């Protein structure tokens, strides 16, 4: 079921909070975007990504839960919302059907390579916790709270592998090599 962002802003009280505290709301489906390419993408050639997020300090605020499509809903899977619907909806639907051409773990991986959230604040209160910190690490902790091995969560394993390879490349730059 697809809902308009305006309906969601109203239904969950975001518009009321926005007005009360003078904080703006942005519908990422209707904002300017740029085409982003990355050789590390696993399925997309390029992604239309909201320009407003590129240089912003991005905080992901999910509720931790198991999920049929993602295995686990966390800070990184929450970024699926950054895919603008006008580019990823099907011809006869308002949902983002084009991100479901393949397993969603690939869409989560690729959108997070455009820009990973800078911080995660995960409501895991159902399990007695609030998780706060680096998004990948917080999602790993969330998986543990849900009784999963994080390496069995497709998008977490893919992102960890990609980011580990990048860290390994960074470590090799400037190392003294003995003969």
Residue spans for each PLM region:
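Extended, low-polarity segments enriched in aliphatic/aromatic residues
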Residues: 2-179
